[in-house]
């Protein structure tokens, strides 16, 4: 049994610890700033644009010359408001990226003009670093047995973001989850950070004809923030449907323009 003299300092210590823990807890659940949410929106919008550009460019290349891009990397880059998508592969020494085809976006976003690079144009800049980054991410990524898409976007300090996310395989079914965002060094050779955005893959079934969904919903267990691919998930749907994202302390809503609001704070 504790004596009276000993019990008092112990009680004071416990109270101090409780206050410290409460303070630390409060810090960990502070709401994200408008700038943080806007950055997620911006990356999600770019990811959706990249995905659509790669899709339409691939269709255009395969129409022009079927099977010629099998086994090649596709890499998209936005310049002056338009997307260019190149198809090619790394040289054996990984010092150049050989471009075999280039598809340039036209006035309509879904239209691409394809040109074949007969001289096998080689790139030693963005496309080279992006191709390296893709292969580094491919080597690390461990997914389930299903198709995945990959995208490369610019990151701060000339680094690269590489996204690996499940591909849509059935009409009107839009998968979300099981995705990773890598932060790769500027030269494309090293993983700086690996962010598992969602664990499992969710594939909500399409609604019956005549029914309309007010909003989708899924939960996050890995972070207290919505992810870039949550924005992508909303934007890729046709028609677009808002998505509610529940975390341990917040309820977010991703709107059909990609913007994010905090709907509720949980204690």
Where are these regions (language model features)?
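Bacterial N-terminal signal peptides that target proteins for export
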Residues: 2-14
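Non-cleavable N-terminal signal-anchor transmembrane helices
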Residues: 2, 18, 25-33
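Active-site-proximal loop/helix of nucleotide/amide-processing enzymes and allied scaffolds
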Residues: 27-116, 122-157, 202-267
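A short, well-structured beta->alpha microelement
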Residues: 191-206
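A short, surface-exposed beta-strand/turn
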Residues: 97-114, 174-192
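Charge-rich, low-complexity terminal tails
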Residues: 172, 176-180, 184-186, 192-196, ...
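Bacterial N-terminal signal peptides
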Residues: 12-22
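Non-catalytic interface/targeting segments
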Residues: 139-149, 153-185
């Amino acid at each position: 049994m504790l004596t009276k003299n000993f019990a008092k300092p112990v009680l004071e210590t416990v109270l101090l610890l409780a206050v410290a823990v409460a303070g630390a807890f409060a810090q960990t659940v502070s709401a994200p700033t408008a700038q943080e949410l806007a950055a997620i929106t911006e990356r999600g919008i770019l990811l959706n644009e990249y995905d659509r550009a790669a899709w339409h460019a691939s269709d255009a290349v395969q129409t022009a010359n079927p099977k010629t891009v099998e086994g090649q990397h596709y890499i998209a880059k936005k310049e002056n408001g338009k997307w260019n998508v190149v198809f090619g592969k790394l040289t054996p020494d990984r010092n150049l990226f050989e471009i075999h085809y280039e598809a340039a976006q036209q006035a309509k976003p879904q239209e691409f003009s394809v040109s074949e690079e007969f001289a096998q144009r080689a790139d030693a800049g963005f496309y080279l670093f992006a191709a390296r980054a893709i292969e580094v991410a491919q080597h690390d990524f461990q997914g389930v047995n299903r198709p995945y898409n990959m995208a490369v976007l610019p990151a701060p300090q000339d680094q690269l973001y590489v996204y690996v996310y499940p591909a849509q395989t059935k009409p009107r079914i839009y998968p979300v989850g099981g995705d990773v965002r890598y932060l790769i060094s500027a030269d494309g050779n090293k993983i700086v950070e690996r962010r598992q955005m969602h664990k499992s893959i969710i594939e909500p079934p399409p609604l019956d004809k005549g029914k309309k969904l007010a909003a989708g919903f899924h939960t996050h267990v890995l972070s207290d923030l919505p992810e870039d691919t949550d924005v992508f998930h909303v934007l890729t749907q046709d028609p677009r449907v808002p998505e509610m994202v529940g975390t341990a302390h917040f309820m977010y809503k991703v709107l059909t323009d990609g913007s994010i609001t905090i709907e509720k704070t949980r204690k």
